[in-house]
């Protein structure tokens, strides 16, 4: 069998050899599937003009639209696409090169000569460290007809390191492994940035709902203060509601009406401030989503309180198995092991085995030449090199530090889960107390109003009861929002996709 007939099947078999396994960063299969599932199938980075927000927005719609319009998120998409491209480049193992030369020369005392030559070379690098080289050439000819009609030369060779740079320490294997590790790191970073952006938009959305709720509370306070002022004025003046400054019936009556008026004005002042906070919160939400910060879309998702029970003993192992921080450290550990493997390989003798065959074809201008072959071993032994020894020591020290960082990170993951569980439990307890406080403050407000109407107390008692009711309503609303955001942070700490299961 000639080398031409054996070349095709050989290269096909080498090309079809299995590649490196995908880097899963030591994460659980469910978590890695979640990370991969968060990546978009297609990426369009073309700039788009700012758009107006729709008239109605749910929380789920806000999160989805954020991934389409947020400018900062596109940078994460770009980095992910770049990492994919780097792996595509690193995984190129076959290099194909074509060359041609044509010149006309005349030696001293000789006749002008035309020299034409062309060649095609292919090199295929194996992850074992070896390389297959195929060279085809025409030799030097005088006419183009000779180049196109002759049988070209063919050289097939195979070089394989036996010690230094062999196997997992080969440059080809390490190049592909490093690119896949970089892609895995970027995939984890993309998932984290997606989680962070989702958490921020959810917090913005509920910040608007909180501001809207505080506006509603302030409106009710203004209405109650105005009604009480009207009642006080009619009660002690015997006339209809008019502007202050008239002659009052007694100093006590004048003080009560002034206090009622002051309470009314303070309530209106609070309402103006709450409206400003609502506008600021809405602008923040629209900017984070990627919309023009104008308009006031209706937010259709409402604040709901759904208490849940959490078991720390069950959640901590889940968080450890799904932690992207631990996943990054595992990838860094794989990089450190690779550096140690390469450093130890560099201390070994450089032994390369070579074998090949040659077929010159008709390139020697009609001189018949039979097929030849070659084979041998080349060896270089490093006798003394401080740098190679130091490289191995540095790799070992880096791994030791990395192991300590892994231990500390595992402790931080546990602490984060414990902290979020404590926050959820505390928030749930404060909500229960807040609901009772609102009910008691409402009763106290009604009782104070009744005592004032019967002349058993002055307005200061009513004012104090009113302030307590407003504060209780506001605190309860804040705790309900805080509880929901705490559950979002807990899901994030557990490695769950916070975009899933959002209320409509």
Language-model features, listed with the residues they occupy:
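Bacterial Sec-pathway N-terminal export signals of envelope proteins
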Residues: 21-117, 163-180, 187-191, 245-254, ...
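Short terminal targeting/anchoring segments
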Residues: 458-478
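Bacterial N-terminal signal peptides
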Residues: 8-17
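Bacterial N-terminal signal peptides that target proteins for export
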Residues: 1-8
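Small/polar, glycine/serine/threonine/aspartate-rich low-complexity segments that form flexible
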Residues: 47-54, 101-158, 298-312, 341, ...
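Periplasmic alpha-helical coiled-coil/stalk elements that build and connect Gram-negative outer-membrane
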Residues: 181, 187-318, 420-423, 427, ...
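Metallo-beta-lactamase
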Residues: 274, 324, 479
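Sec/SRP-type N-terminal targeting helices
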Residues: 74-78, 91, 127-151, 162-188, ...
């Amino acid at each position: 069998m000639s080398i031409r007939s054996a070349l095709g099947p050989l290269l096909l078999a080498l090309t079809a050899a299995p590649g490196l396994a995908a880097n899963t960063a030591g994460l659980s299969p469910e978590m890695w599937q979640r990370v991969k599932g968060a990546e978009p199938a297609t990426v369009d980075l073309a700039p788009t003009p700012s758009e107006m927000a729709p008239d109605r927005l749910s929380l789920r719609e806000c999160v989805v639209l954020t991934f389409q319009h947020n400018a900062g998120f596109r940078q994460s998409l770009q980095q992910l696409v770049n990492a994919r491209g780097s792996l595509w480049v690193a995984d190129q193992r076959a290099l194909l090169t074509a060359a041609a030369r044509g010149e006309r020369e005349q030696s001293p005392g000789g006749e002008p000569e035309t020299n034409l030559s062309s060649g095609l070379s292919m090199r295929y690098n194996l992850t074992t460290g070896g390389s297959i080289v195929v060279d085809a050439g025409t030799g030097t000819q005088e006419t183009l007809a000779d180049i196109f009609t002759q049988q070209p030369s063919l050289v097939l060779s195979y070089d394989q390191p036996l010690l230094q740079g062999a196997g997992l320490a080969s440059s080809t294997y390490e190049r592909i492994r490093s690119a896949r590790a970089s892609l895995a790191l970027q995939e984890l970073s993309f998932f984290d940035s997606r989680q962070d952006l989702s958490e921020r938009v959810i917090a913005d959305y509920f910040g608007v709902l909180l501001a809207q709720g505080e506006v509603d509370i302030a409106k009710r306070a203004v209405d109650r203060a105005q009604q009480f002022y009207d009642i006080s004025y009619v009660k002690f003046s015997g006339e209809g509601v008019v502007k202050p400054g008239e002659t009052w019936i007694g100093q006590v009556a004048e003080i009560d009406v002034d206090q009622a008026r002051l309470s009314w004005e303070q309530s209106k002042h609070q309402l103006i401030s709450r409206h400003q906070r609502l506008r600021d919160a809405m602008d923040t939400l629209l900017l984070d989503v990627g919309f023009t910060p104008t308009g006031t879309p209706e937010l259709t998702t409402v604040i709901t309180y759904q208490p849940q029970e959490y078991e720390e003993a069950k959640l901590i192992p889940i968080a450890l198995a799904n932690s992207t921080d631990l996943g990054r450290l595992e990838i860094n550990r794989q990089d450190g092991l690779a550096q140690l493997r390469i450093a130890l390989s560099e201390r070994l003798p450089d032994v390369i085995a070579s074998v090949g065959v040659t077929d010159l074809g008709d390139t020697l201008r009609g001189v018949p030449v039979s097929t030849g072959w070659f084979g041998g071993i080349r060896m270089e032994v490093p006798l003394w090199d401080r740098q190679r020894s130091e490289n191995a020591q540095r790799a070992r020290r880096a791994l030791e530090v990395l192991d300590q960082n892994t231990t500390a990170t595992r402790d931080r993951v546990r602490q984060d889960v414990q902290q979020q569980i404590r926050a959820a439990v505390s928030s749930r307890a404060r909500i229960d107390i807040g609901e009772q406080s609102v009910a008691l403050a409402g009763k106290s407000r009604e009782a104070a109003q009744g005592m004032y109407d019967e002349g058993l107390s002055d307005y200061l008692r009513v004012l104090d009861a009113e302030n307590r009711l407003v504060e209780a309503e506001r605190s309860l609303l804040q705790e309900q929002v805080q509880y929901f955001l705490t559950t979002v942070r807990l899901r994030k700490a557990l490695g769950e996709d916070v975009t899933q299961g959002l209320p409509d």
